[in-house]
Design a protein with these regions (language model features):
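Residue(s) in the substrate-gating loop at a strand-loop-helix junction
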Residues: 385
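Short C-terminal tail/terminal secondary-structure segment
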Residues: 336-339, 483, 487-501
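Substrate-binding pocket helix/loop in short-chain dehydrogenase/reductase
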Residues: 340-342, 346-351
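Active-site helix of classical SDR
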Residues: 365, 401, 409
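Short, small/polar-rich loop/turn modules that mediate ligand/substrate recognition or access, typified
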Residues: 417, 422, 486-488
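Alpha-helical segment proximal to the catalytic Tyr-Lys
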Residues: 370, 414-415, 484
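Glycine-rich flexible loops
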Residues: 1-257, 269
Length: 501
């Protein structure tokens, strides 16, 4: 039994009822509902399942014998700065940060390289239900978009016109931003505020690409009319499907963050807080355990030696290639190798401390800047130390390195403000749940002040214990819109230190 398209829900139920009443439905193995799908039935579950397999297999065999998918090869290399620019434009049109997940599979690039792509990709969705996820059509992007990615604004304008053509009294227009793109020669892009949303759109795009091409070879790809798709897009039951989407009020929803020194302490806590606030978080650390640690707190861990410029460059590019850009960079990786005096300190300790704490911070910032220029609320947070202002004996290399990154951040704030990138410093002190504070390091520090370890832990003015979690929360707040007008700031989180004050 084959029935023409009608709206889903009660109208569809009534259509099927009217068609089958008065005759034996068992003479059919199933029902094909145009633009909905195939339905099989029986009083026996196994028989209904076997009927489905039979009908689908017949369709697969016919398509295999008669359908053709055009295989177009593309040798294009993706310009990641263009991808970041596209993401920023889409985020602006939607009014919130969006991920931009690019499918560069051979099949996706081949589809995007077709000569007729602007026509076949702009007719409508595979099934009208997809419209709530993908909108009616994707935006078609040039292989090398202009500086403003004008195709995005054109899409927005056309969506507004589409709404005006089809609206009825009482309807309020949904946001006009695209949810998917066909990027000429480069593949397809899914836009969303979560990885889950992007994955759903990517799956839909994958099925749609194949079906469009097979449909064209079998007589022509013909979706529903614009009006029929509009009616489903603005159908109250369809909108209810999206009503409970997670993360709408999260401070960093849809943002992309990189945190160094993420395998423990402040870095790990920062990753956990940012992820809880909706960000996609990539934690870097030389410790291989970073993968397991980040998985537990909702992020992705990557092994990286931040003193290796090639590794840093490669990983930043990889993050942008996967998620579409970069919004937050937290420079936390650091080391405190010993408590020796200047006289006793080895050259190796000095060189390693400066290399990890200062030079590596400069280089990761340098590698991140091109992408942060296209970030949404772009922010760099540098983790300094109380030692920048109040150094201690036996901590010369560490104190110099933290004074250095503080000056580096101040200069970066001056240089990057015209690009809308905020740069701020947080100065923690006595955060004892970090790897820096080994038992040996605590004993040495306490000895310098002629006090016990317990006394040393509580020697700040407020007499409070500073936890990594609280530093992470400060990082999250400072990189959020709450501090949209703050750059070049230095914020202590140390319980109060009389030498600093």
């Amino acid at each position: 039994l084959i029935l023409p398209y009608v709206m889903p829900g009660f109208i569809l139920s009534k259509q099927v009822y009217n068609e089958i009443k008065g005759f034996d439905i068992n003479q059919y193995k199933g029902i094909i509902l145009h633009h909905h799908g195939v339905f099989t039935y029986s009083n026996n579950a196994r028989e209904a399942y076997e009927n489905m397999i039979e009908l689908v297999t017949r369709a697969e065999s016919y398509i295999s014998e008669n359908g053709v998918v055009q295989h177009v090869e593309s040798q294009s290399e993706v310009n990641l700065l263009d991808l970041a620019r596209i993401r920023k434009s889409v985020s602006a049109s939607r009014g919130s940060a969006q991920l931009a997940m690019l499918d560069q599979s051979d099949e996706a690039k081949g589809f995007a390289s077709r000569d007729d792509i602007a026509d076949i990709a702009s007719r409508g969705p595979l099934t009208p239900d997809h419209v709530t996820r993908t909108k009616r059509i994707p935006v078609i992007l040039d292989a090398k978009p202009d500086e403003n990615v004008s195709e995005i604004q054109s899409f927005v304008n056309e969506y507004k016109a589409y709404f005006e053509r089809n609206k009825v009294d009482g309807l309020i227009m949904l946001d006009p931003a695209p949810r998917a793109a066909v990027w000429s020669s480069n593949g397809t892009i899914a836009f969303g505020s979560t990885v889950k949303e992007c994955n759903i759109i990517t799956d839909i795009a994958r099925h749609t690409r194949w079906t469009i091409q097979v449909g064209e070879s079998l007589g022509g790809w013909k979706p529903l009319s614009e009006r029929e798709i509009f009616d489903l897009e603005y159908w109250v039951l369809q909108q209810a499907k999206l009503a409970n989407d997670e993360g709408k009020d999260n401070a960093h929803q849809g943002k992309i963050a990189i945190v160094t020194g993420a395998a423990g302490g402040i870095g790990c806590a920062t990753c956990e807080v940012l992820a809880a606030e909706g960000a996609v978080v990539i934690g870097l650390d030389i410790d291989p355990d970073v993968k397991n640690v980040l998985k537990e707190v909702g992020g992705t861990g990557m092994i990286c030696d931040v003193t290796d410029d090639n590794q840093v460059h490669k990983i930043i590019d990889e993050v942008v290639a996967i998620y579409g850009g970069l919004d937050i960079l937290v420079c936390n990786a650091g080391t405190f190798l010993s408590g020796e005096s200047i006289e006793e300190m080895t050259n190796k300790i000095w060189d390693n401390t400066i290399s990890i704490n200062l030079t590596a911070t400069c280089r990761i910032i340098k590698n991140a800047i091109p992408y942060l220029k296209f970030g949404v609320g772009a922010s760099i947070i540098v983790i300094g130390s109380r030692n920048y202002a109040a150094p201690g004996a036996g901590a010369s290399a560490y104190s110099v390195s933290k004074a250095g990154v503080t000056q580096l951040a101040r200069v970066a704030a001056l240089e990057l403000a015209p690009d809308g990138i905020r740069v701020n410093v947080i100065h923690p002190d006595a955060v004892f749940d970090t790897k820096l504070w080994t038992k040996k390091a605590l004993q040495k520090s306490a000895k310098r002040y002629n006090i016990t370890v317990d006394e040393y832990k509580n020697k700040n003015l407020l007499g409070v214990e500073v936890k990594s979690q609280k530093v992470g929360e400060m990082v999250s707040a400072l990189s959020s819109d709450l501090f949209y007008a703050t750059t070049g700031a230095q914020i202590p989180i140390d319980g109060g230190n009389d030498r600093v004050i």
